[in-house]
A protein has these predicted regions:
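C-terminal accessory regions
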Residues: 22-189
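Mixed-charge, Lys/Arg-rich low-complexity intrinsically disordered regions
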Residues: 1-22, 26
Length: 189
């Protein structure tokens, strides 16, 4: 959202300053190429921060948790495979925002890497995600506050061996909605 008075952009999903460190857990926050599984929510590990001769970061290299993510892009850049096996190059992304009434021609452009740190993510963000072996998944189901939210969290790992639940498991936080249970009963008649 663009502030009409000072032109600042808020609620864009981007930070004023992106600070990353090698081996940090990261997540894409925009769809880059849906056919190549480079989609919003895809997680991985930062392998490299590549800079140009003047010291500016030209691209990042990420080893995605899902092996299929970025496979087509990696095939187009075989040189990268020699220096960073399995790594996918992520370049800056730009978004344009209108600064005034539509059609006035005033725009702002936001340029940043479409990545954030992701050492911890919310249950809602994990919906549809798979935690691939051998990675482990530490889940705090005590924070579940909606029906089926614990199910969304518990269903992410591929096996029980990957699952770690710290503290005491309170089964009161694991429940389905009454409407879902009614539908389930109808289907089983």
């Amino acid at each position: 959202i663009v502030n009409q008075k000072d032109g600042t952009v808020s609620n864009s999903g981007f930070m004023d300053e992106l600070r990353l460190k090698l081996n940090a857990k990261v997540m894409l926050i925009r769809n880059i190429d849906t056919c190549d599984s480079l989609t919003n929510g895809q997680t991985g590990t930062l392998m490299a921060i590549e800079k140009d001769s003047s010291g500016y970061v030209k691209h990042l290299v990420v080893l995605f948790d899902r092996p299929a993510a970025g496979k087509q892009l990696r095939a187009k850049n075989p040189q990268l495979a020699k220096t960073h096996p399995g790594g996918t190059m992520i370049e800056t992304y730009s978004w344009q925002y209108s600064l005034g009434k539509t059609g006035t021609g005033s725009t702002a452009t936001l340029i940043q890497f479409p990545i954030i740190l992701a050492h911890a993510i919310t249950a809602h963000k994990t919906q549809g995600m798979t935690v691939y072996k051998p990675k482990t998944c530490s889940l705090d189901v005590t924070s579940a506050f909606e029906a089926a939210q614990a199910y969304v969290m518990l269903g992410r790992p591929q096996s029980l061996e990957q699952l770690f639940i710290p503290g005491q498991l309170d089964t009161n936080n694991i429940y389905a909605s009454s409407k879902a249970l009614e539908e389930y009963k109808k289907m089983n008649k």
